[in-house]
């Protein structure tokens, strides 16, 4: 029953999903870029204030 549902749903949705996925994918990439830019700006601000402390917080100690 699951196989039949997958075939039917997949066959009917392929044509409809392709344009939607392309549009959704472009929107997702823009959101990810915005989030990445915000994160990089935050890191830059931290590095300007105290680079040594920032680096120490990410250094692994004792092989962990």
Swiss-Prot record:
InterPro entries: Ubiquitin-like_Pup. It comes from the Bacteria. GO terms for molecular function: proteasome binding; protein tag activity. The keyword ATP-binding does not apply. Protein modifier that is covalently attached to lysine residues of substrate proteins, thereby targeting them for proteasomal degradation. The tagging system is termed pupylation. The N-terminal unstructured half of Pup provides a signal required to initiate unfolding and degradation by the proteasome but is not needed for pupylation, while the C-terminal helical half of Pup interacts with ARC to target proteins to the proteasome. HAMAP family: Pup. This is Prokaryotic ubiquitin-like protein Pup. The gene is pup.
């Amino acid at each position: 029953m699951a196989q039949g549902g997958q075939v039917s749903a997949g066959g009917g949705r392929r044509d409809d999903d392709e344009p939607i996925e392309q549009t959704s994918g472009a929107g997702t990439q823009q959101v990810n870029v915005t989030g990445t830019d915000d994160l990089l700006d935050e890191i830059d601000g931290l590095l300007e204030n105290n680079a040594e402390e920032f680096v120490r917080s990410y250094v692994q100690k004792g092989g962990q």
